[in-house]
Amino acid sequence: MNYNYTTPPILNSVIAGGHILALVKQDNMLSIAMFNKELKAKSEIVTLSGFKGFILDAKEDKLLLSIGDKLILVEDSKQRIVLKSERSENFFWHATRVRNKVFVQEYGASPTGIFVSEDLINWHKLVLSTDLDKHSKHFHNITYDHFRKQLIATFGDGCLTRVLFSEDLGYFWRPLYKGPWQFVLAVPLKNKIIFGMDSGIAKGG
């Protein structure tokens, strides 16, 4: 793929192994490209079929990508589908790493799930959004709070439960916040947790 752009069409990027790895879109194709600090392409790692996606996790020589309704593992420039949503309109939006485990959150039509893997190949469904509140539509985010040693998940759209936490890595969840405000991102700090707002007050709020 030829990148003749002043600003490459980068969907998202991560820093791994001292390099900038970016998910780049051109026409109807995606690719993972390695860039230098000036955002000049050094090499292309792999080309993928799709028009939207995210780099969810990067560690050593493995990349975990969300492309359409699939989780794709890229290793040694080879790609494989490791998980697929039960609904074609859904996608995997965020991931968080806790020691040797990676947790991924699904977004889209109800119900959506949180999945976990230790090797990025075999995935186990931990919980569905409707297991935690039958009126919820989907999860918005999952992150690990290193200060409080707990997983934090935001979700909603149709219910008053907006934030949940788990102290046993996703098997048992409790509400952290119920109310009108709906969030996407959660950033844990030592003495507080900062939440990024959703687009507005959703139904149920």
Segments and roles (model prediction):
Residues 79-98, 125-131:
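Asp-box/WD-like beta-propeller blade repeats and closely related beta-sheet repeat scaffolds
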Residues 21-42:
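Beta-propeller domains
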Residues 7-17, 48-60, 87-97, 135-141, ...:
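Repeated scaffold domains used in trafficking and secretory/extracellular systems
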Residues 35-42, 76-80, 115-125, 165-174:
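Asp-box/BNR beta-propeller loop motif
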Residues 104-119, 123-164, 175:
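Solenoidal tandem-repeat scaffolds enriched in leucines and small polar residues
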Residues 152-156, 160-164, 173-205:
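Beta-sheet-dominated scaffold domains
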